[in-house]
Structures are given as structure tokens and as C-alpha cells.
Amino acid sequence: MSALRTRLDELIAQTDLEVSEKQREQLVGYVELLDKWNKAYNLTSVRDPLEMLVKHILDSIVVSTHLPGERFIDVGTGPGLPGIPLAIMNPEKTFFLLDSLGKRIRFIKQVVHTLGLKNVTAIQSRVEEFQPEEKFDGVLSRAFASMTDMVEWCHHLPKQDSGVFLALKGLHPKDEIDLLPEWCSVTEVISLAVPELEGDRHLVILSRKEN
């Protein structure tokens, strides 16, 4: 068993997540591809694949039990984070991964092909220019500096009545919550336990206020 797989198993054992043999292999395969492509294309500032397991894989998959609905878009996905790990964890749900940079989308398409992911679609577009035929149950991102930017730039993406925004943040973002636009409200703030990650992690679930 590879050092990556051994380390991944150790980390997962510190959570309540149920992760199958196939999913573990796919998560390791994703890290191996990210490490390989990163050397040429600079997709992430994290250089050590063992560190990627904590900062990219575990940091993403701890969200997998908090996904309401079936259809999701990961905005500003970069090299596929959190979208690829979440798609691996939730093969019955559909994920669209959006980024404006071609090299990132090419990488994601390679991952999808290599790992045989049937539930991921990569889209190269700026978020404000992307007009989906069908709206989403959840709009995910860990890329936005502010939640106000996230909800304003992505306001056209969630389903009108039931769609939510899912923002992955570090410290509890009280100051950001105070600055949210009038039409947006915080449904829940969930403290996430990421094994061996320094610092706090929170998932903020936001929705449109009911008229």
C-alpha cells in the first residue's frame, strides 16, 4: 500500500465518514494527478502530496454529509476543490465545476477521464457569464474572499425557492455575515472537524430570504 493511501486511511479513521475502497483509491488517484500536473502547471500552492491529503482532500470531504439535494456547482473550483473530492464521495449526485482558467479545466477533464467519474462536468467560464439551463440545489465555493461577493456573483445559479449557497470558510465569519445583502440570510453555520488541520473551518449555508 502506498504512503499516500496509508496516510489517507489514518486521516479518515479520525472522522465519522464512511469511505469505500473504491472511493479511497479515487481520492489517492486524484492527489497523484494533482501532484504530477502541479509541477508543470502550478495548480496549487501546496507542494507536498501528503499535505494535500489534509488541506485539500479531508478539508473537502468533511462537507459531504452537508449537501442538500442532487445538483451542485463548484464556483472558482481551481484544480477541482472541493468539487472532485465531493463528487467521489457522492457518486449519486451531479457536480458542475466552473473555472475561467483553461489549464485548470484541462486538468479536471483529465481527472474525470482517468478516474472514470461519471458525475462531473467541467465548465470554462466566468461565473457572471455562465447561464445554466437548469439551476442548482447548491452553489459551493471555497474560492471567494467574501461571502457577499459569492452571493452577488452567483445569485443567478441556485434554484429560486430551494437552492442554497455553501461557503467554505476558515474562522467563524461573523464580520462577513454582518455585511451580507438584504435578500440573503444565513441558514446555518457548521463547525467542521478536519483531522490535523491547523485553524478553524466552517461551512456557512446561505439562502434567499422568503418574500
Curated annotation (Swiss-Prot):
Biological function: Specifically methylates the N7 position of guanine in position 527 of 16S rRNA.
Catalytically driven reaction(s): guanosine(527) in 16S rRNA + S-adenosyl-L-methionine = N(7)-methylguanosine(527) in 16S rRNA + S-adenosyl-L-homocysteine
UniProt GO MF annotations: rRNA (guanine-N7-)-methyltransferase activity
Keywords associated with the record: Cytoplasm, Methyltransferase, rRNA processing, S-adenosyl-L-methionine, Transferase
Matches recorded under Pfam families: GidB
Transmembrane segments: none
Domain of life: Bacteria
Enzyme Commission designation: 2.1.1.170
GO cellular component: cytosol
Gene3D superfamilies: Vaccinia Virus protein VP39
UniProt cross-references to InterPro entries, sorted A to Z: rRNA_ssu_MeTfrase_G, SAM-dependent_MTases_sf
UniProt record similarity statement: Belongs to the methyltransferase superfamily. RNA methyltransferase RsmG family.
Keyword Zinc attributed: no
Main localization, broad class: cytoplasm
HAMAP family: 16SrRNA_methyltr_G
Binding site for S-adenosyl-L-methionine: 76, 81, 127-128, 142
Enzyme class: transferase
Location in the cell: Cytoplasm
Protein's name in the database: Ribosomal RNA small subunit methyltransferase G
